[in-house]
Each structure stands twice: as structure tokens, then as C-alpha cells.
């Protein structure tokens, strides 16, 4: 199901005596005497954070999670970040989660943060990575993933509710291995912003908390005290900041019942399974395998990759100029949301990599309006792109020719932050880590579980991740996964003096890349159901014919220098398959009653194989979707709070096909 995207309404700021005032809530962001000192007193000291940080374990797998109800100027985050670096163990990681219904525009944010030069180092990094203010989740990483920020844009209750597995407080606590350690309840006054202090929100906060979780807020309102108490928190008295008489501190003590109307059957998640060691075995050394290996290694895991070929970055990941591009739409569906979230995150990841490695360019790409259907689709984006010009701009024939550097027959959609990346080189960079071992020349034909670890080719690990593309359903445990093979062939031609003027990737019925080493890569064929990467001259000619239609005024060389074919793996709904792998027979038995009512509450998590995960079926958009999917999966394996909303976890879950079959019947 899809519905129109509702754009974010940014904060309407009025500056009074050099202080930011919210016209939406008729309240001030911070007072003249407040700011850093108030944040330090209320949130840092109110949650006893410095003492708690100093007692944390000194390993990378340890994550301390802080959640905030109103991001505002970001000052609480920046101060927390600075103090974390000073007092927390060097290898520990901070995950900061926040939300804002009306976020500040970047220029307003810059002006607000100029008031605190002592936070300038952190401020500069936040401004650099400040996201396009589209609705939903934005995940930002700083300091090589030591500090992460999940910034949710939208209604606070809706955003935090999506972090729940099921919404039943008893089952939620059975399933949850990751909790918020400390809460910053920071929003405008309860009398002016009631939704941020509602009973329903505090019920969700309780479900995301454990007995050691603390809460702090500047408010001393009886409404807040009552709501926290009803949710299972014990209130502690504390003097307020400055002239304020009181503030509220609290700690979570016990679970209360949750509203039955808000429960969701947790068919997408499994019960916790003990992991004796932080060891992982990954089958497949393509982009998916290398990204998940990198994400786990950063968390202190020892990782082994088993690759069938003689090196990583082969097969479907062997494209030396893979194109990064989004799938923009004015409609909100799991597919369009996942594609947008993924593109924004991937773009941030690749920008950071390009600071250190010469493995591509992000100078933009052009999606040509090459037929009436594509033209109509692009025209439907006009209003969306007016609100978010950073995502793309519609250009006419003259503009498209100027942007690309060559004569083009039509206009199109210019994506300014996209471009191309060398996938094999990227794979090499990702696994350049002392915690990652690579074993090549090994085709895995069976997997075994010995009641403690997974065993593949006499190698044992507590966790097994199948990231082997089209071969992911070759095993007994995975043969229910509906993965289809799609063969694609790229053609490499000699560049000419005229064609070397091309500056950015062009996409239409096919696509062509700017010259690299005196040659252009042109592609790509699309053969559904073909699982062998055989090369053929017919596909070369097909690619050359498409190239002529993309830019007919250019004299392209017909001299084929090389060609390459790879097999893409895709699912029926073209979303990837990522997450814990269900036992098909047990799943059908437990959830059989969904056939008569797909929304029926069943108080059971998915029956999954212990510590067995799938990470495959990324299709032709792997460069775009793999970074976010693997970062989420690594967090799940490492017992961290999700960086994706529940609806998107369900959208990519390996269990979704079994559930659909139960509901729809054979």
C-alpha cells in the first residue's frame, strides 16, 4: 500500500534578542541563562552519565544508548558527544536517538550553534552531515562509527513506536536485547506541546527501557510526573536549574500493561539466542558480505569471509563503475521509503570514503526523460523537488547537455549527489581490517549447526550470515526464499575526443559512464532467469544500440575493448532479503491463524534458526541499499536498538514471503 509523502514542515524561527523563538509552539528554544549549563545540569548530571560512562566495559561491542524526545538545536547531542569523548572508554560507542517534528533548517541550526564555540568541533561535523529534511529516519555516523545519531523526523509518538518489536510490554521485554540507557525528555512546555508528554508516549518509553534506565527532564509538571509513574518509573526529587524550583529525574522499575489495540504480531523478529563468542562467518565476498564484515569488525567482532572466487568483489559486485542513484517517488510505500533512506545514508558513507580513497566520483548523474512514461514520472516529482532540491532538479534539454558536457536529445532529472563507485576496489577497502579474515576459492554447499556454533568447511562461528547472492537459497534451510537470478552484461568501448567530454553518468533505457582510463562502460542487459554469466556479442550490440539512443549526436566508438557479465539476485518485490532466517515449517504452524485475519495478534516471535541471517537479493541497486541494510543487520546481531523503523524491517524480512503465502494461500 502507498500514500502520498507528507513533507516535513521545518521550524518557523523568530529571533528575539538574539535568541531563537518557535512560532509553532510559542516558546523559546533556550533561555539566555540556559544553554550548555542547563543541559549539563538537567540531562548529564540528572542521568548521572559521567559516572556511568566511566564504569563501562572497554570493548567496541559495548553501546550506550541515549534517546531524546526533541532534537531542537542539537546542543544536547553535541554536548553529550563532547563529554562522551572525554569520559567514556576509548573503544565504547555512543548511539544517540532523537526526534523532531519541525526540525531547524541548516542555516537556522548554524546560527543557533554559533552561540557555543566550545562545541565547534562537534558542530562542524554535525553541520557537514546534517541530512536532507525528508520525513522518517536518518542515520548519521561520526568518528568512524564511534558516535552515531539516529534522527527521526516526524511525530514523536509515531517515530518511537516504530522502534518497538510488537507493542506488548511483556513480550517486548522478552524479545528485547537492546534498551535505551538514558532518556532526555526535552520538548517545549507540556502546556504548549502536549503530544510530547502524552501517556501513550511514556508507555512506549517504558517498553524501550530496562531497570537501569534513567530519565531526566527540566519539567516538574504534575502531568509529567503522573505519566511517568503510570508507565512504571519511580520519580526522584531534584532541584531545578537556576531559578527553577524543581526538575524531574526518574528510573524505570517495573512493567505495566500496554494497550491491546497497539499490539503487532512480531513475525519479523526472533527470540534472543545466546552468543558465547563474538565470531561471525560470512558466505559471500561481494558488496553485501564485505559491508557486513566491515560493520561487525568495527563493533569488535572477529569475522571470516568465505568467497567462491579468488578474490572479493567478483560476481555481481565486479562493476568498476557502479552507479549510485535513488528511486524517487511522491508516494510513500515500504519500497520508496527504503530506497530514500538507503540513498541518503549511502551517499554519506561514500562521501566519507572518497575523502581518503580515489574510488569514484559523486558529481551527480542524469536520468533522462527518454520516453513519455519516464517524462510523466519525472513531472510528478515537481512539488517534491521544490521542497527538496538537494534530492534532484528537473532540467530541460539545454540544461541536461550543459550538465553532462555532451549534446543530449532531451531533458531529465539531475541527481546532484549521486555518481559512481568502483565496487571491487570498495570491497578491498572494506575488508582491510585486522579482524577480518578472507578464505577464497571455496564454494559452500552445506551449512551445519552443532547446537552451539555454525560450522562451514570445518570453520566454526557463533553467527552465520549468508550473503551469497543468487545462491542464497541453495541450502535446505533457505530453499523457501524466492530469489531470482537476473543476468546483466556491461560493454567497454574506446573513448573518443568527443565522448570524453561526458562528465557524469547518463541513465535511460541503458546507461553510460564517463571515460575512465580512455574507455566508457555501457550497459546493461537485463535477462531475468538467467543464472550463468556467459558473455555474448548480441548483448554488446544491444548496449551499443541503446547508447546511440541516449546521445545520438555523439560519435561513439564501436570498438569493443572488453565486456563483463554478472548475476544480480532479486526478490519478487525488488526489496532485499535481510534479517534472521525463519524455519519455514515451524513458521507456518505458529502463524497459521493469520490466514483468517492478517492482523490477528499472535503472542509469538518468529521461529528462526539460531544466529543464522540472510543478507541478499539487492538487485541492481546494491550500491545504494547495501550500506544501510548491513549497518542495521550488524546492529541487530550486536544487540543494538534498531536504526530502521519496524515497518521497513518487516519489508526486508526473510519471513515476509512465508507470511504472505499463509495469508493469500497456495
From Swiss-Prot:
Main localization of the protein? cytoplasm
Listed GO MF terms: flavin adenine dinucleotide binding; oxidoreductase activity, acting on the CH-NH group of donors; tRNA (5-methylaminomethyl-2-thiouridylate)(34)-methyltransferase activity
Q: Name the segments for region: tRNA (mnm(5)s(2)U34)-methyltransferase.
A: 1-253
Q: What is its EC number?
A: 2.1.1.61, 1.5.-.-
UniProt cross-references to Gene3D superfamilies, sorted A to Z? D-Amino Acid Oxidase, subunit A, domain 2 (3.30.9.10), FAD/NAD(P)-binding domain (3.50.50.60), Vaccinia Virus protein VP39 (3.40.50.150)
Q: Which Pfam families match?
A: DAO, Methyltransf_30
- UniProt xrefs under SUPFAM superfamilies: FAD-linked reductases, C-terminal domain, FAD/NAD(P)-binding domain
Q: Which UniProt keywords apply?
A: Cytoplasm, FAD, Flavoprotein, Methyltransferase, Multifunctional enzyme, Oxidoreductase, S-adenosyl-L-methionine, Transferase, tRNA processing
Q: Which GO terms describe its biological process?
A: methylation; tRNA wobble base modification
Would you identify the family this protein belongs to, as annotated? In the N-terminal section; belongs to the methyltransferase superfamily. tRNA (mnm(5)s(2)U34)-methyltransferase family.
This chain belongs to the protein called tRNA 5-methylaminomethyl-2-thiouridine biosynthesis bifunctional protein MnmC
Source species, please? Legionella pneumophila (strain Paris)
The gene coding this protein: mnmC
Amino acid at each position: 500500500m502507498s500514500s502520498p509523502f507528507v513533507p516535513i514542515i521545518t521550524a518557523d524561527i523568530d529571533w528575539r534578542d538574539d535568541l531563537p523563538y518557535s512560532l509553532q509552539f510559542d516558546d523559546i528554544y533556550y533561555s539566555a541563562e540556559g544553554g550548555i549549563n542547563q543541559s549539563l545540569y538537567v540531562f548529564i548530571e540528572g542521568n548521572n552519565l559521567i559516572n556511568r560512562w566511566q564504569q563501562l566495559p572497554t570493548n567496541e561491542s559495548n553501546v550506550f544508548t541515549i534517546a531524546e524526545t526533541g532534537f531542537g538545536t542539537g546542543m544536547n547531542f553535541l554536548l553529550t558527544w563532547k563529554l562522551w569523548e572525554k569520559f567514556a572508554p576509548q573503544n565504547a560507542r555512543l548511539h544517540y536517538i532523537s526526534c523532531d517534528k519541525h526540525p531547524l533548517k541548516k542555516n537556522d541550526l548554524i546560527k543557533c550553534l554559533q552561540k557555543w564555540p566550545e562545541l565547534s568541533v562537534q558542530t562542524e561535523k554535525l553541520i557537514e552531515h546534517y541530512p536532507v529534511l525528508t520525513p522518517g529516519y536518518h542515520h548519521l555516523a561520526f568518528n568512524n562509527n564511534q558516535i552515531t545519531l539516529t534522527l527521526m523526523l516526524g511525530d514523536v509518538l509515531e517515530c518511537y513506536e516504530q522502534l518497538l518489536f510488537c507493542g506488548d510490554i511483556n513480550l517486548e521485554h522478552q524479545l528485547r536485547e537492546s534498551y535505551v540507557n538514558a532518556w532526555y525528555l526535552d520538548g517545549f512546555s507540556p502546556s504548549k506541546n502536549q503530544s510530547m508528554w502524552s501517556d501513550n508516549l511514556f508507555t512506549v518509553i517504558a517498553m524501550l527501557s530496562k531497570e537501569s534506565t534513567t530519565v531526566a527532564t527540566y519539567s516538574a509538571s504534575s502531568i509529567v510526573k503522573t505519566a511517568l509513574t503510570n508507565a512504571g518509573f519511580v520519580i526522584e526529587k531534584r532541584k531545578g536549574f537556576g531559578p527553577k524550583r524543581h526538575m524531574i529525574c526518574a528510573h524505570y522499575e517495573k512493567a505495566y500493561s500496554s494497550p491491546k489495540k497497539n499490539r503487532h504480531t512480531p513475525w519479523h523478529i526472533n527470540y534472543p539466542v545466546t552468543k558465547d563468542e563474538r565470531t561471525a562467518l560470512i558466505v559471500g565476498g561481494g558488496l553485501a558480505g564485505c559491508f557486513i564484515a566491515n560493520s561487525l569488525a568495527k563493533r569488535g567482532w572477529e569475522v571470516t569471509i568465505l568467497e567462491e572466487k579468488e578474490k572479493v568483489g567478483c560476481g555481481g559486485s565486479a562493476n568498476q563503475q557502479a552507479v549510485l542513484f535513488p528511486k524517487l517517488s511522491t508516494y510513500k510505500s515500504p519500497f520508496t521509503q527504503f530506497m530514500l533512506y538507503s540513498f541518503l545514508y549511502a551517499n554519506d558513507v561514500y562521501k566519507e570514503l572518497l575523502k581518503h580513497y580515489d574510488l569514484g566520483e559523486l558529481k551527480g548523474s542524469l536520468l533522462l526523460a527518454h520516453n513519455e512514461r519516464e517524462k510523466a514520472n519525472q513531472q510528478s516529482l515537481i512539488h517534491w523537488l521544490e521542497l527538496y532540491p538537494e534530492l534532484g532538479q528537473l532540467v530541460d534539454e539545454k540544461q541536461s547537455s550543459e550538465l553532462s558536457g555532451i549534446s543530449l536529445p532531451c531533458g531529465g532529472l539531475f541527481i546532484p549527489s549521486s555518481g559512481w563507485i568502483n565496487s571491487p576496489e570498495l570491497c578491498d577497502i572494506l575488508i582491510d581490517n585486522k579482524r577480518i579474515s578472507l578464505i577464497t576459492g571455496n564454494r559452500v554447499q552445506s551449512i551445519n549447526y552443532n547446537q552451539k556454533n555454525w560450522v562451514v568447511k570445518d570453520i566454526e562461528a557463533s553467527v552465520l550470515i549468508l550473503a551469497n547472492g543468487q545462491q542464497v537459497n541453495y541450502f535446505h534451510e533457505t530453499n523457501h526464499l524466492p530469489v531470482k537470478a537476473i543476468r546483466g552484461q556491461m560493454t567497454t568501448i574506446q573513448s573518443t575526443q568527443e565522448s570524453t567530454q561526458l562528465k557524469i553518468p547518463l541513465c535511460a533505457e541503458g546507461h553510460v559512464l564517463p571515460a575512465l582510463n580512455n574507455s566508457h562502460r555501457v550497459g546493461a542487459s537485463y535477462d531475468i532467469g538467467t543464472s550463468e554469466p556467459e558473455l555474448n556479442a548480441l548483448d554488446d550490440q544491444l548496449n551499443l544500440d541503446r547508447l546511440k539512443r541516449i546521445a545520438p549526436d555523439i560519435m561513439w566508438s564501436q570498438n569493443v575493448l572488453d565486456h563483463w557479465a554478472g548475476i544480480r539476485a532479486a526478490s519478487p518485490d525488488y526489496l532485499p532479503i535481510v534479517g534472521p532466517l525463519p524455519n519455514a515449517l515451524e513458521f507456518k504452524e505458529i502463524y497459521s491463524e493469520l490466514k483468517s485475519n492478517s492482523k490477528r495478534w499472535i503472542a509469538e516471535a518468529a521461529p528462526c534458526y539460531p544466529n543464522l541471517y540472510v543478507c541478499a537479493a539487492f538487485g541492481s541497486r546494491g550500491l545504494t541499499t547495501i550500506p544501510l541494510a548491513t549497518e542495521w543487520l550488524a546492529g541487530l546481531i550486536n544487540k543494538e536498538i534498531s536504526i530502521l523503523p519496524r515497518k521497513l524491517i518487516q519489508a526486508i524480512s526473510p519471513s515476509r514471503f512465508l507470511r504472505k503465502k499463509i495469508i493469500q494461500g497456495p
